[in-house]
Amino acid sequence: MATIFFIQPITEEAEAYYPPSMITNKRKDLGVDVYCCSNLVLQPGLNIIPLHIKVACEHMGKKCGFKIMARSSMCTHERLLILANGIGLIDPGYVGELMLKIINLGDIPVQIWAKECLVQLVAQGDHVPDHINILKRNEIFPLFAPTPRGEGRFGSTGKAGL
């Protein structure tokens, strides 16, 4: 059985960057790059960026969590950007839109261009994905069915602990 990422655009804007397709990970890259779907200007300090996609990950036929990790292109000589929480951990039951909290550590705004990749997705257990399945925007897909975890965003699962 394989490790598969399922990506579904949720806006017309995202459809242009995520056309329906099944991509085979021939290079066996660990991370799946995620596009910015519009031009953005990140002000100094904290910025919240919607990615306009839903994502699910499946390993050995079972839904699993995944991580959002910075790509090396996020921090260059021209810009100093970091993920606010270091690594984003996405629960298997989360079915909402992916969003980023990015901190611009510089003193000036930073331009991000559409189709630029700042982050990548890595399957729980660091399993190399075999396929990336890009779904149609309005397609009904079982892995995005409502769950007790739901679509609650940053910090929505409550207090520390289980």
Curated annotation (Swiss-Prot):
Its cofactor is Mg(2+). GO terms for cellular component: host cell cytoplasm; virion component. InterPro entries: dUTPase-like (IPR029054), dUTPase-like_sf (IPR036157), dUTPase_trimeric (IPR033704). It is found in: Host cytoplasm; Virion. GO terms for molecular function: dUTP diphosphatase activity; metal ion binding. It catalyses: dUTP + H2O = dUMP + diphosphate + H(+). SUPFAM superfamilies: dUTPase-like (SSF51283). GO terms for biological process: nucleotide metabolic process. The keyword Iron does not apply. Induction: Expressed in the early phase of the viral replicative cycle. Keywords: Host cytoplasm, Hydrolase, Magnesium, Metal-binding, Nucleotide metabolism, Virion. Its EC number is 3.6.1.23. The keyword Cytoplasm does not apply. The viral dUTPase may play a role in lowering the dUTP concentration in natural infections to minimize misincorporation of deoxyuridine into the viral DNA and ensure the fidelity of genome replication. Belongs to the dUTPase family. Homotrimer. This is Deoxyuridine 5'-triphosphate nucleotidohydrolase. The lineage of its organism: Viruses, Varidnaviria, Bamfordvirae, Nucleocytoviricota, Pokkesviricetes.
